[in-house]
């Protein structure tokens, strides 16, 4: 079969070549130029008028070759062979713009060869230190109308890629590509019906019959499939994807006609893309080789532009606990989020991720609580709240002031050029603000983690939130996770009706790579699995080396599917094995371990529980682990030493400390001074190192200043107090209200190394007397709740995030100041007992188009009602609402839902203001 396929491949290439030669009267030319000869990068382009087929080989000339051929019609085709055997048959190349058709009528006018050698370092991924060598040939063609087309072909030991170069100086509009990959119809295929979420289920089929996988995604006889798409051709694996996509282009996918061998590149939404010229398109990429080659491939990153972030010291991969998966309502519960912070602190996790539902009113307090315990906070955002530059500027500066270190951004669901332009913008902004980022509801990674190393992970996968499927788990190890970090959210041990075993679940964060690994269970679920807890405490988030061990996406001879991968961090190897099927013995040859004797801890299923065993092995041994149905195992190997009984490294956590301010609240008029002190203590434990206490002057409002020296201690033993004192000067034009002045203590984390210092913070609330006219939207909230998203200041209620509303509008009147709620909503404001009157124009915002019903209530101290409206409906004119607030300290403004639920209940408090003492 293989020999027949090779003959078909050879005849196809020769046929294209001879046709072109005959048309040019050049049949006597028998030598095919090869890029194997070294040509300096600076060598001028040379014309090869006699050539119509050219070979580019991998630098070692050992396995892969790409063969580019030009036929009699001037059409280009590219074929790929491995070890002389065909892998991809000749597939069309070419590109169309609104000015030129560069898919036919082409002739070669130049060629340039070079070897690309690149070394770089990643912050995440399967291998931190990278080295890539690729053979590159740039072919220059001229079209029938005189336009020039560059085709750049690169071949490495793990794949082949090509891109188009258009050297036009003005804007270039690409209307489509002729690019196709030709795969034998009977080749095994693992495909994913295309969806912009990349959350479709993968299916095993054949290349020709792939359209039967999910006919609902098809139009007529053509179906679309998302990257990466995997094929097996006579023992060689081919993973098709793309690399180096940014806002100059759109993402693409593969279109396939039923029964055909061609998989054609289609631009997102079948829309043209326009870019400033000259234009280099994304790389059309095929990772080619054995499963070992695929698992270890870094080709997608190798093809991406170098890092645009010079200083990466602030970027830290790690593990986070995450409450949303096990309880979707929990991110809105401050106390529950503290539980997750406590768990992270106790088990050495770097982060807590707070998902959809968090409240701006309590996030700063949660961040202070977490940082004092050595845990950093990641916040979820709906991308609708970060779409514009103004939104990003406002939110990023705010959360940086809170102490948030990263964001998880959700719901992009698009491969359009405009979306990639948004990716460019938010990546630039997060790099400038030193915010790490995880893209959820996103496209797949196409090398962006090399260019933007603050990208910790990307979803682009049907993950845990979409149910369980052990077969899917195996497929993903050989498809999606090959091309970049994958936010799969593993380890939900307590999941009801779990379909895989405990050991399968534990193995997933080793089988899958992610710069941020979001653990899916809750503290109680983890506590019920102490063996798993111990293993997860040791788990790194970035790797020095990754190896394929055994298994594959296809069924084994015994009927099950397996994936076993090994990843190294320092001198320790972590091994994860997962199985889809009835169970059996999983085998892991240990040749990757190297010389000497090794200690191996193995965690596997036994009688429905996790059991840990320890043994000594060498690289000649094979680990054999009995596996349950849909089971697996997790192992940890380290060099054996006398007296060593495990591979654990210490889990070092931040100690409990106290930071108290005295007083915690002070009053100062505009332009006046206020003084306060602070005391920091370590009650017990080993002495702290490099301790510093200061006022964070960078977070003071404009016009404020702070006097007083920082207080430092090289060593602070338990029981000894560190004291400081400062005086702040209030800005002369400071309006009434309360400003939080942060007092910060930092000290070296006991773990040492590159672990960031522990940050302990308390705030002194400096209260400036309210005077004159005071707008409610300018005051800090003592508390806040809302029916949907946050309460908005000076705009109507928007989406799930903040600052995404529209101008407050009731009955056609626009109000520049006020509050926007979605009933039921409420805010509490400190009046200091200095105000006498509250007034506002209230009603349902016009954006509801006549829908919605709301009540408005004003409450004083002890929730005493001061004023209220009847039920107001959408389309009603604004109603004046006034209340006597003389002597009131806490004012509460409440919007009720009118008794019929909260839909469309956008409650506006137009020009909500107070009259206070002068």
What spans do the regions from the language model cover?
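Secretory targeting and sorting signals
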Residues: 2-39
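An acidic-aromatic substrate-binding cleft motif
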Residues: 276-351
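Aromatic- and carboxylate-enriched substrate-binding clefts and catalytic-loop regions
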Residues: 356-501
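Carbohydrate-binding surface patches
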Residues: 557-595, 633-636
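C-terminal beta-strand-rich structural cap/linker in extracellular carbohydrate-active enzymes
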Residues: 615-651
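Gly-Asp-aromatic-enriched flexible segments
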Residues: 760-918
């Amino acid at each position: 079969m293989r020999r027949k396929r090779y003959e078909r491949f050879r005849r196809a290439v020769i046929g294209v070549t001879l046709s072109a030669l005959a048309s040019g009267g050049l049949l006597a030319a028998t030598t095919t130029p090869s890029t194997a000869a070294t040509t300096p990068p600076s060598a001028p382009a040379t014309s090869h008028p006699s050539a119509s087929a050219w070979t580019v080989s991998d630098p070692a000339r050992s396995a892969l070759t790409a063969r580019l051929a030009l036929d009699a019609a001037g059409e280009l085709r590219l074929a790929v062979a491995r070890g002389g055997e065909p892998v991809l048959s000749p597939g069309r190349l070419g590109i169309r713009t609104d000015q030129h058709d560069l898919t036919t009528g082409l002739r070669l006018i130049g060629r340039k060869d070079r070897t690309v050698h690149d070394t770089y370092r990643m912050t995440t991924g399967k291998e931190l230190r990278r080295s890539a060598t690729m053979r590159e040939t740039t072919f220059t063609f001229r079209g029938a109308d005189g336009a020039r087309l560059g085709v750049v072909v690169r071949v490495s030991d793990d794949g082949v890629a090509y891109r188009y170069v258009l050297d036009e100086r003005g804007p270039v509009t690409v209307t489509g590509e002729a690019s196709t990959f030709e795969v034998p119809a009977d080749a095994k295929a693992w495909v994913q019906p295309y969806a912009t979420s990349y959350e479709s289920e993968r299916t095993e089929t054949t290349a020709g019959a792939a359209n039967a996988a999910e006919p609902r995604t098809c139009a007529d006889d053509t179906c679309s499939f998302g990257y990466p798409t995997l094929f097996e051709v006579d023992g060689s694996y081919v993973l098709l994807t793309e690399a180096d996509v940014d806002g100059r282009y759109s993402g693409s996918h593969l279109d396939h006609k039923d029964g055909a061998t061609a998989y054609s590149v289609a631009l997102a939404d079948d829309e043209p893309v326009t870019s400033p010229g000259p234009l280099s398109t994304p790389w059309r990429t095929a990772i080619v080789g054995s499963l070992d080659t695929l698992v270890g491939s870094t080709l997608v990153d190798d093809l991406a532009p170098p890092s645009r972030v010079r200083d990466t010291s602030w970027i830290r991969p790690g593990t986070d606990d995450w409450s949303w998966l096990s309880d979707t309502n929990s991110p809105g519960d401050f106390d529950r989020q503290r539980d997750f912070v406590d768990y992270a602190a106790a088990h050495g996790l770097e982060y807590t991720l707070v998902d959809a539902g968090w409240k701006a009113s309590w996030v700063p307090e949660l961040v202070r609580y977490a940082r004092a315990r050595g845990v950093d906070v990641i916040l979820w955002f709906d991308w609708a709240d970060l779409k514009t530059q103004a939104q990003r500027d406002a939110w990023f500066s705010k959360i940086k002031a809170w102490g948030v270190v990263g964001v998880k951004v959700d719901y992009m669901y698009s491969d359009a050029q405009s979306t990639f332009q948004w990716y460019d913008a938010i990546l630039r902004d997060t790099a400038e603000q030193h915010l790490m980022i995880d893209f959820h509801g996103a496209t797949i990674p196409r090398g962006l983690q090399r260019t933007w190393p603050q990208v910790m992970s990307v979803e682009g996968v049907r993950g845990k939130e979409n149910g369980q499927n052990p077969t899917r788990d195996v497929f993903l190890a050989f498809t999606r996770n090959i091309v970049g970090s994958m936010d799969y959210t593993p380890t939900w041990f307590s999941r009801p009706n779990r379909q895989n075993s405990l050991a399968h679940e534990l193995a997933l964060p080793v089988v899958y790579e992610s710069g941020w690994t979001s653990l899916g269970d809750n503290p109680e679920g983890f506590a019920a699995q102490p063996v798993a807890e111990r293993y997860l405490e040791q788990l790194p988030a970035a790797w020095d080396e990754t190896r394929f061990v055994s298994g594959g996406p296809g069924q084994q001879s015994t009927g099950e599917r397996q994936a076993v991968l090994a990843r190294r961090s320092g001198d320790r190897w972590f091994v994860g094995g997962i199985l889809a099927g009835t169970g059996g013995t999983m085998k892991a040859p240990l040749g990757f371990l190297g010389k000497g004797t090794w200690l191996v801890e193995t965690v596997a299923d036994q009688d429905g529980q996790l059991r840990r065993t320890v043994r000594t092995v060498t690289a000649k041994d094979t680990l054999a682990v009995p596996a349950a149905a849909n089971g697996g195992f997790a192992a940890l190997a380290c060099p054996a030493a006398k007296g060593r009984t495990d591979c654990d490294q210490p889990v070092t956590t931040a100690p409990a400390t106290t930071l108290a301010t005295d007083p915690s609240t002070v009053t100062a008029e505009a332009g006046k001074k206020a003084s306060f002190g602070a005391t920091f203590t370590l009650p017990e434990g080993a002495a702290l190192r490099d301790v510093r206490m200061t006022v964070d002057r960078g977070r003071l409002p404009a016009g404020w200043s702070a006097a007083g020296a920082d207080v430092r201690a090289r060593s602070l033993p338990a029981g000894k107090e560190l004291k400081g004192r400062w005086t702040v000067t209030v800005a002369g034009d400071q309006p009434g209200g309360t400003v939080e002045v942060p007092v910060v203590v930092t000290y070296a984390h006991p773990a040492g190394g590159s672990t960031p210092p522990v940050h302990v913070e308390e705030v002194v609330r400096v209260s400036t007397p309210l005077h004159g006219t005071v707008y409610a939207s300018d005051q800090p909230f003592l508390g806040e709740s809302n029916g949907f998203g946050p309460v908005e200041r000076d705009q109507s209620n928007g989406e799930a995030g903040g600052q995404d509303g529209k101008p407050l509008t009731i009955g056609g009147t626009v109000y520049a100041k006020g509050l926007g709620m979605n009933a039921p909503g409420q805010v509490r404001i400190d009046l200091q007992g200095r105000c006498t009157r509250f007034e506002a124009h209230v009603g349902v915002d016009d954006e509801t188009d006549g829908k919605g019903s709301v009540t408005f209530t004003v409450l004083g101290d002890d929730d005493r009602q001061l004023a209220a409206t009847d039920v107001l409906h959408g389309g009603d004119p604004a109603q004046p609402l006034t209340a006597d607030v003389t002597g009131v300290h806490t004012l509460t403004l409440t919007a009720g839902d009118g008794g019929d639920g909260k839909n469309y209940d956008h409650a506006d408090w137009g020009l909500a203001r107070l009259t206070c003492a002068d």
